[in-house]
Design a protein with these regions (language model features):
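RNA-binding accessory domains that recognize and position tRNA/RNA substrates
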Residues: 1-16, 41-42
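A phosphate-binding catalytic loop at a beta-strand-loop-alpha-helix junction
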Residues: 110-123
Length: 123
């Protein structure tokens, strides 16, 4: 009997909402090269990317260039610092609540929002 072990890959799971979408994905650089994953992310044409991970986690995935590269493509980037397997603290929750109007406006205006953490499963 042969057992096939699948390698995790960078994949964006999208949910279409009216004319916009919400996507969920891992950190670019987590499963393959940052540049390959970044290209796949921007091919989805998001207007907004929200990273829910810590700076050390971003460093471990070689993703510290993510904000700058998104900015250069005029894609808004927001960072909510949430530890893996934890709930957001009060500050992070306030930041999330302040982002909600931007995210809703983007989605219901026909744009795309991609949320990422390290593994792409959610915090």
């Amino acid at each position: 009997m042969e057992i096939e072990i699948s390698k995790s890959v960078f994949e964006i799971v999208k949910i279409e909402i009216e004319s916009g979408f919400v996507g969920l994905c891992p950190m670019p650089g987590k499963f393959s090269s940052f540049d390959e994953d970044f290209l796949q992310l921007v091919k989805e044409l998001p207007q907004v990317v929200v990273t829910c991970a810590t700076q050390p986690e971003m460093m471990a995935c070689s993703a510290t260039r993510l904000p700058e590269k998104l900015y250069n493509l005029e894609i808004q980037w927001f960072h909510i610092d949430v530890e893996d397997f934890q709930v957001p603290d009060e500050f992070s929750e306030e930041k999330w609540n302040s982002l909600l109007p931007i995210l809703k406006e983007t989605i219901f205006g026909g744009g795309g929002v991609i949320l990422n953490c390290v593994g792409g499963c959610g915090r």
